Amino acid sequence: MEELDIIRMNDSFDRPNWDEYFMLQAELAKLRSNCMTRQVGAVIVRNHRQLATGYNGTPPGIKNCFEGGCKRCQLRMEGKIESGASLDRCLCNHAEANAIMHCAILGIEAGSKNAILYSTFMPCLECSKMAITIGIKEIICLDTYPETDYDLIKESAVTIKRLDKDKIQYWAKTLLNL
């Protein structure tokens, strides 16, 4: 049998840290979004293990947003509704809500034992309330969101961390060998 060369790794081996790794998973999830106005991905993690993913879009069985399933998003794209307005009329579930619902559907207790919510955007007020309710201990995001209540999140003792978007883009390019 032919002998294999053993590649020795050293301390300088370059790889994403855990936060970067799971944010890349959220970035991948957002590619499944069917929302015309904003694409968001989310991942719930506990003990460095991914519990659930979510992306924003219409509920299962409903016409995709980009196919005309959400009239609110259509009006937004036509410039008839401003960003952040009439969110109660939007049919798209948010990525964070979808990840939380997937945990419920699968019978996974998401929030206990220091679970982390990774999201490509800071969660809105409603998704923040859901994350607090299930016991998420930390929210890690890439971008801000205008409908976030930071005071509520801080009052609940959930920590917030914003990652460097350039670093995530670096890893995405590395993945694609660009």
What kind of feature is each model-predicted range?
Residues M1-L178:
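Zinc-dependent deaminase catalytic domain
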